[in-house]
From Swiss-Prot:
Species this chain originates from: Vesicomyosocius okutanii subsp. Calyptogena okutanii (strain HA)
Protein name as catalogued: NADH-quinone oxidoreductase subunit D
Record field: catalytic activity: a quinone + NADH + 5 H(+)(in) = a quinol + NAD(+) + 4 H(+)(out)
Primary localisation category: membrane
PROSITE patterns on file: COMPLEX1_49K
Function: NDH-1 shuttles electrons from NADH, via FMN and iron-sulfur (Fe-S) centers, to quinones in the respiratory chain. The immediate electron acceptor for the enzyme in this species is believed to be ubiquinone. Couples the redox reaction to proton translocation (for every two electrons transferred, four hydrogen ions are translocated across the cytoplasmic membrane), and thus conserves the redox energy in a proton gradient.
GO MF: NAD binding; NADH:ubiquinone reductase (non-electrogenic) activity; quinone binding
PANTHER family: NADH DEHYDROGENASE [UBIQUINONE] IRON-SULFUR PROTEIN 2, MITOCHONDRIAL (PTHR11993:SF10), NADH-UBIQUINONE OXIDOREDUCTASE 49 KDA SUBUNIT (PTHR11993)
């Protein structure tokens, strides 16, 4: 009689629910997962080594391409590390702008997660709802940086430029009538802050729509409740951070526990789960969007009342004004040196981390006194979460693997680096 053995199934790396180039070797008994072995590295681009070959100010763009749905949060950790080494003072207005865009980025990330997680488990319409709002926030990225994704907006010493006084508008085309164009540009008549204020006012209605679609939906709860349960103690042992840790009931958020920028001057709550399952993590992220919306509202109010500089006036680090370069030789030299050689950091090492939408995103930077880093180590939150895949899926059905990948909210740009 032949021996009965478990079936080995390859999941990915080309799979619509893999959220990138994830390959899972699944050992299954019928439809029950016995073992899940994640294979990573298929998107490895050697980012940490690339950063070592460029001056400090030329590596900000690499950060955008790590977690490519949470771009500005990646930049924030890197520029904070450089600023700490240089003892560089960042203008308060620039810090408020950074916090505002960190929270815009958090909403962008969670909308992407919500839409794709819905598609993974069969809720098709939520994807269209989520991307409706996401498009508006992507326009805010474009307004300040000219880019819809890889902004490179944060710079050591502040941000690239102040918020624009005029929000970009849709142009006439053969594909839209004049009436449609007028409707699309209705809330784009003022400044970027006016546009964001309008978004903040309307966004709670959108979150209620998502709630109505999913939160009490019987099928949604059947797919998420008691799936991928991780206890609070085990979540800490596994190195979970962000919504994965808070979903297990641990109230840990760097914005509250180790405040940076101006988070200690803002009011917001930290949502935590109770059971540590996929449904709790869904509820945590939904509430995080509400809290981010509230933080943005406070930032808009402060920025309207407090004009000022958005970049350090140390021109060894920040570029001089172009008007000065036309008349002042020293400004021209500083500009040339800044974009060819960059600047040197004192010898030493520093670790700076931010509360990224996916967890703790940290940059450990070692300087040997040159104009390039000696070593940059990136602490990606998704790496620890994916490492728990075997433990989270064991004993679940094959269809639940897709739910667990979705609830982890993994992006392989940061995991593979």
């Amino acid at each position: 009689m032949s021996e009965i053995r478990n079936y080995t199934l390859n999941f990915g790396p080309q799979h619509p629910a893999a959220h990138g180039v994830l390959r899972l070797i699944l050992e299954i008994d019928g439809e029950v997962i016995e073992r899940a072995d994640p294979h990573i590295g298929l998107l490895h681009r050697g980012t940490e080594k690339l950063v070592e070959s460029k001056p400090y100010n030329q590596s900000i763009g690499y950060m955008d391409r790590l977690d490519y749905v949470s771009m500005m949060c990646n930049e924030h950790a890197y520029v904070m590390a450089i600023e700490a080494m240089l003892n560089l003072k960042v203008p308060k207005r620039a810090q408020y702008i950074r916090v505002m865009f960190d929270e815009i980025t958090r909403i962008l990330n969670h909308l992407m997660w919500l839409g794709t997680h819905g598609l993974d488990v069969g809720a098709m319409s939520i994807f269209l709802y989520a991307f409706r709002e996401r498009e508006k926030l992507i326009d805010c990225y474009e307004a300040v940086s000219g880019s819809r994704m890889h902004a490179t907006y944060y710079r050591p010493g502040g941000v690239y430029r102040d918020l624009p006084d005029k929000m970009p508008q849709y142009l006439a085309s053969d594909f839209r009538t004049s009436k449609e164009l007028e409707t699309m540009n209705e809330n784009r008549q003022g400044s970027l802050l006016d546009f964001i204020a309008d978004f903040v006012k309307e966004f709670p209605k959108s979150i209620k729509q998502y709630d109505d679609l999913l939160t009490d939906n019987r099928i949604w709860k059947q797919r998420l409740v008691n799936i991928g349960v991780v206890s609070a103690n085990r979540a800490k042992q596994l190195g979970f951070t962000g919504p994965m840790l808070r979903g297990s009931g641990v109230e840990w958020d760097l914005r509250k526990n180790q405040p940076y920028a101006v988070y200690d001057q803002l009011k917001f709550d930290i949502p935590v789960g109770m059971t540590g399952d996929s449904y709790d993590r869904y509820l945590v992220r939904m509430e995080e969007m509400r809290q981010s919306n509230y933080i943005i509202k406070q930032c808009v109010k402060w920025l309207r009342e407090n004009p000022g500089a958005v970049m350090s006036d140390d021109h060894k680090v920040s570029q001089p004004k172009r008007t000065n370069m036309k008349n002042d030789m020293e400004s021209l030299i500083h500009h040339f040196k800044l974009f060819t050689e960059g600047y040197c950091l004192p010898e030493g090492e520093v670790y700076r981390a931010v509360e990224h939408p996916k967890g703790e995103f940290g940059v450990y930077l070692i300087s040997d006194g040159a104009n390039k880093p000696y070593r940059v180590k990136i602490r990606a939150p998704g790496f620890s979460h994916l490492a728990a895949m075997n433990e989270m899926t064991r004993g679940h059905m094959l269809s639940d693997v897709v739910t667990i990948i979705g609830t982890q909210d993994v992006v392989f740009g940061e995991i593979d680096r």
